[in-house]
């Protein structure tokens, strides 16, 4: 007997209910009616042939023939209204009231996994819920041949005999496979294969029932990505067994997709590994690029596999960096250089002659990136160069003409762009290292702005470990570099967690030692009088001298100077306040050294402060501090302490010594003696803020050589008492640290950014930094290849609070940057560059490194015997610019007038000026007397008479300009002198010669005579014309003057003598006719007077 039989016979509740149905004439419950309706639609033939077997599925109740008399068969829903009509107790009333609907329609079971509406974000207001109406009932299936079933014993259930459930599952899988085929990542589009039908299931029935069942299942029930809109469901094929599920052709995004029954599908086509994503370049409408592209190479992009296993985050970031202006924020040591080298390699392949530029803020960083790109990307060394400011401009110009890949500092790049040495239109890729510096007016920002003026088709890749500490600083980086997308990873990101080793961070806080408390007490008593004076003047509100800071004093000084008291105070009071502020600000730095770095740096600072007061140096208040009794007592205490080599002036320094010693002892350092001391297996790096602190830490650790071999690592600038390190020395220290010559580096901020110092097992932060950028740069130096330790040494109070603030700020900023909701990106300035329709496919392969790249020397330009000359400055013209001059009317949108619209204005003929009579011009006798009496005579005790200048006096001196002091000669004076010089050159026989010339011209034919030609032209009687040589043409000979006067009696104006004389000049030049060999040798008498013009022209 099966479990179903036991359920029907042994359940006392069911038997009581059957007895009550017979007595109360009530219909069966709805559950029994639904089960009976489903049983009637099944194939009843197979059930009759099973004598000793029962269908054990959960939706049917079938009993044996022997037990039929014991159990009443349930009526069908269609017979519910008349099944108990002939029962004798049908009319008896019952105390149980059961609602019986008048119309009953058989309904199939509905499996609902999700809502039927399309997916939508949670913040959107949804509309009313709606369910698709039920389809019309299918026609009754045709009877099929019964299939024998295997008889099983009690307790065995066959869950695969429900054809409806199998068909529904097959239909759901068909829809799921159709969705996966549409989202295929492979290039070949293969339609999913049809499912194989089972032999023991009816074909037509399965098709019909599965179709009805699929209508009630939501379209997106099996979608793995809600951002994709599901396609309409395809007609499913027949399937009766879960073992005959269709095979998926793809799996989106490498996620393991399973069915409702926890069964995974298998893919036939090859697909990307788990975690890798495929991105296509964005489709944009833009002008074609000016770069020459390699049409054969742009169909694929190369991903090097030289370094072994492919990292998913590097693959995905590289793919986005090829097609977008990308800001990459990765923790230190996770392969930002590999990403940059891969992107540079692909753009090198895609273009024929375009140039690629990698910029880094310092020269050591530039040299480090060169070696990394040579060994990873395989870019030929012959096409690569490293340019710095040390190279001559002529050499740099030659390199810009011949090479394609450049490694340089941003300052050198902007200088070459502005001078015209570099062509901005040829640059296709700009890689920016340490991109968090690209704010304000830094060289990175200037380079991008300059390139954008001339080039609209270039890509930007920005690399950094921490983009910024505030929203404003991150937005400034995005604006300065025109970033369109951000890829950020933290140490908690899932795709990089396996590549980041554990880092144990230990935070140790300290209190002031007894020596430090004594020093603070004495210094506080020394500075208290000056602080009280500032408080009396309301210039500073603090009371404790140990709370002084340089920044606080500077702000207080500015506020006091801007206040009414500061503006209205006397100059003496202003000088006093400024002097006190200056002295206190100088000692505020020493207070920080005492609190956070140690007594020895503090003592060095006080010695320098005391040395500035020797003799007459230093101000009044500075000498007042040095001569104070508490200051002298303080110096007497500090001097013997610092001279003791065993003295340690800060509790942090004592703890630092113990931590470093324990680390090297645990690692077995120094156990091999002096011979094995140079082969270190572990490294330690200590970060400090000031050089004095670095030297003090190195002094303490050098006591334990050779176990601890420390080396100070500082910047290039020289400071008081400390010389800087040039770049060659810095690189040498780094190389020795990698080799094991030094196993401990005590570095300032120069060791925080960028430099590949190598694998470090222990990081000790001697002082805390309030900047999240500096904090993360420090902590990122360990935990790259193996587990690392970080020890933070903090003083209680301000330093501890600064660390907590920096840590919280970093975590908050990483979340905001990853979300991208607080920032504005520049997608419009991120061009596609590639032609439309081109979608490169990844080509993972091993890159063959050229033999020339194995050379260890940097690719700097070789020194030449003769340095080439700097080329002339070249001005690059932006695209689509308007050359030439443009009128303001055209800029304002006005229409351009053609030449035909312009009408030439007719110039009127000038009328001759009437010559007034001589009597009207010359003063009368009465006017002359009035002039002399009123204007020429000055009445005084000694009358003075002002006379007109005499032109006849000093004739030789009037031919030249006389020297002046204040008032220079006017234009009239210069003209007068010029006229007198010309008159002086006139010879004595000019009258005779003029007559001869005029006589010769008058006897010539009319066609050749210049006089006749000038008179025959129209208008010559009234105005003066000039000849071709620019000289006035002669008018009339003297012999015909009176004849022309007779002809002009009709009212025309006669020619004046001056006009007639001026027409007789030589056409060949300014030399007058008077110039002759005979007249040049004549010497004029002193009393010679030139002839009158009227007399000259009137004589015949």
Swiss-Prot record:
Enzyme class (EC, first level): hydrolase
Subcellular location: Nucleus
Motif (DEAH box) on chain: 433-436
Molecular function terms from GO: 3'-5' DNA helicase activity; ATP binding; ATP hydrolysis activity; four-way junction DNA binding; four-way junction helicase activity
Chemical reaction(s) catalysed: ATP + H2O = ADP + phosphate + H(+)
Entry EC no(s): 3.6.4.12
Comp. bias (Low complexity): 38-61, 237-249
SUPFAM superfamilies: P-loop containing nucleoside triphosphate hydrolases (SSF52540)
Composition bias, Pro residues: 135-146
Protein name (record): ATP-dependent DNA helicase mph1
Annotated source species: Aspergillus terreus (strain NIH 2624 / FGSC A1156)
Record gene name: mph1
């Amino acid at each position: 007997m099966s479990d179903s039989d036991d359920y029907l016979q042994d359940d006392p509740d069911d038997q009581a209910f059957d007895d009550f149905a017979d007595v109360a004439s009530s219909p069966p419950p709805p559950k029994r009616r639904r089960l009976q309706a489903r049983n009637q639609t099944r194939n009843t033939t197979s059930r009759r042939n099973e004598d000793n077997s029962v269908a054990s599925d959960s939706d049917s109740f079938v009993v044996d023939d022997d037990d039929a008399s014991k159990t009443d068969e349930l009526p069908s829903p269609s017979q519910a209204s008349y099944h108990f009509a002939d029962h004798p107790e049908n009319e008896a009333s019952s105390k149980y009231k059961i609602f019986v609907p008048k119309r009953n329609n058989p309904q199939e079971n509905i499996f609902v996994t999700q809502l039927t509406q399309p997916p939508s974000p949670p913040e959107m207001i949804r509309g009313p819920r709606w369910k698709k109406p039920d389809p019309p009932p299918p026609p009754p299936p045709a009877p099929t041949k019964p299939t024998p079933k295997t008889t099983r014993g009690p307790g065995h259930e066959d869950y695969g005999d429900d054809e409806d459930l199998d068909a529904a599952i097959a239909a759901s899988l068909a829809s799921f496979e159709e969705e996966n085929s549409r989202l295929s990542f492979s290039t070949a589009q293969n339609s999913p294969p049809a499912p194989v039908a089972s032999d023991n299931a009816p074909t037509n029935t399965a098709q019909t029932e599965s179709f009805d069942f699929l209508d009630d299942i939501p379209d997106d029930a099996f979608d793995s990505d809600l951002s994709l809109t599901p396609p309409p469901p395809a007609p499913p094929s027949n399937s009766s067994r879960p073992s005959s599920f269709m095979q998926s052709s793809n799996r989106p995004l490498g996620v393991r997709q399973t069915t409702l029954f926890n069964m995974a599908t298998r893919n036939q086509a090859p697909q990307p590994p788990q975690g890798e994503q495929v991105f296509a370049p964005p489709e944009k409408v833009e002008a074609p690029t000016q770069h020459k592209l390699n049409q054969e190479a742009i169909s694929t992009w190369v991903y090097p596999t030289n370094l072994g296993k492919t990292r998913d985050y590097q693959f995905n970031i590289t793919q986005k960096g090829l097609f977008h202006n990308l800001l990459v924020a990765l923790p230190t040591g996770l392969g930002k250089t590999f990403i940059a080298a891969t992107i540079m390699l692909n753009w090198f392949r895609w273009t024929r002659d375009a140039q690629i530029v990698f910029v880094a803020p310092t020269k050591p960083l530039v040299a480090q990136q060169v070696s990394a790109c040579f060994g990873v990307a395989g870019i030929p060394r012959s096409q690569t160069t490293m340019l710095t400011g040390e190279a001559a401009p002529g050499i740099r110009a030659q390199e810009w003409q011949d090479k394609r890949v450049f490694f340089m500092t941003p300052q050198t790049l902007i200088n070459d762009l502005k001078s015209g040495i570099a062509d901005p239109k040829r640059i296709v890729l700009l890689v920016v290292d340490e991109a968090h510096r690209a704010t304000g007016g830094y060289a990175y920002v200037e380079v991008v702005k300059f390139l954008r003026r001339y080039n609209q088709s270039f890509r930007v890749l920005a690399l950094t470990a921490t983009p910024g500490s505030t929203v404003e600083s991150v937005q400034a980086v995005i604006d300065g570099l025109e970033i369109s997308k951000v890829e950020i990873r933290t140490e908690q990101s899932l795709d990089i967690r396996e590549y980041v080793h554990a880092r144990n961070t230990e935070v140790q806080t300290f209190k002031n030692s007894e020596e430090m408390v004594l020093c603070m007490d004495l210094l506080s008593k020394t500075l208290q009088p000056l602080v009280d004076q500032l408080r009396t003047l309301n210039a500073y509100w603090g009371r404790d001298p140990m709370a002084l800071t340089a920044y606080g004093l500077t702000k207080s000084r500015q506020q006091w100077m801007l206040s009414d008291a500061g503006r209205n105070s006397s100059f003496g009071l202003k000088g006093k306040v400024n002097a006190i502020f200056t002295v206190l600000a100088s000692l505020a730095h020493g207070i920080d050294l005492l609190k956070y770095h140690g007594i020895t740096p503090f003592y060095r600072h006080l010695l320098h402060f005391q040395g500035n007061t020797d003799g007459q140096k230093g101000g009044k208040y500075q000498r007042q501090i040095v001569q104070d009794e508490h200051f002298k007592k303080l110096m007497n205490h500090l001097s013997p302490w610092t001279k003791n080599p065993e003295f340690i002036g800060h509790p942090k320094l004592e703890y630092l010594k113990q931590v470093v010693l324990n680390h090297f002892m645990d690692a077995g350092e120094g156990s091999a003696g002096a011979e094995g001391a140079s082969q270190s297996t572990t490294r330690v790096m200590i970060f400090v803020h000031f050089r004095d602190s670095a030297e003090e830490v190195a002094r303490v650790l050098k006591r334990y050589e050779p176990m601890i071999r420390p080396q100070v690592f500082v910047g290039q600038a020289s400071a008081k008492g400390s010389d800087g390190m040039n770049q060659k020395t810095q690189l040498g220290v780094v190389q020795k640290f990698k080799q094991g010559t030094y196993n401990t580096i005590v570095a300032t901020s120069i060791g925080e950014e960028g430099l590949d110092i190598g694998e470090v097992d222990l990081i000790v932060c001697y002082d805390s930094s309030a900047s999240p950028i500096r904090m993360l740069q420090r902590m990122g130096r360990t935990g790259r290849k193996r587990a690392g330790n970080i020890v933070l040494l903090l003083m209680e109070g301000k330093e501890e609070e600064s660390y907590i603030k920096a840590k919280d700020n970093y975590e908050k900023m990483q979340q905001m940057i990853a979300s991208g909701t607080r920032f504005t990106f520049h997608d419009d300035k991120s061009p596609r560059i590639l032609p439309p329709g081109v979608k490169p496919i990844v080509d993972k392969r091993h890159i063959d490194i050229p033999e020339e790249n194995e050379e260890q020397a940097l690719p700097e330009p070789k020194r030449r015997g003769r340095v080439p000359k700097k080329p002339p400055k070249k001005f690059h013209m932006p695209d689509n610019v308007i050359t030439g001059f443009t009128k303001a009317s055209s800029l304002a949108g006005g229409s351009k007038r053609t030449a035909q619209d312009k009408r030439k204005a007719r110039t009127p003929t000038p009328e001759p000026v009437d010559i007034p009579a001589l009597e009207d011009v010359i003063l009368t006798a009465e006017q002359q007397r009035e002039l002399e009496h009123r204007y020429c005579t000055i009445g005084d005790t000694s009358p003075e008479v002002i006379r007109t200048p005499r032109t006849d006096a000093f004739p030789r001196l009037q031919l030249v300009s006389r020297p002046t002091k204040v008032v220079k000669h006017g234009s009239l004076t210069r003209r007068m002198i010029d006229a007198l010089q010309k008159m002086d050159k006139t010879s004595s026989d000019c009258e005779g010669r003029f007559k001869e010339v005029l006589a010769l011209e008058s006897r010539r034919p009319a066609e050749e005579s210049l006089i006749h030609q000038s008179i025959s032209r129209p208008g010559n009687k009234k105005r003066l014309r000039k000849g071709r040589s620019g000289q006035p043409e002669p008018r009339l000979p003297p012999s015909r003057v009176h004849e022309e006067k007779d002809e002009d009696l009709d009212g025309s104006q006669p020619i004046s003598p001056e006009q007639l004389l001026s027409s007789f000049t030589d056409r060949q030049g300014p030399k007058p006719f008077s110039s002759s060999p005979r007249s040049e040798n004549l010497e004029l008498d002193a009393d010679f007077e030139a002839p009158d013009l009227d007399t000259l022209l009137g004589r015949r």
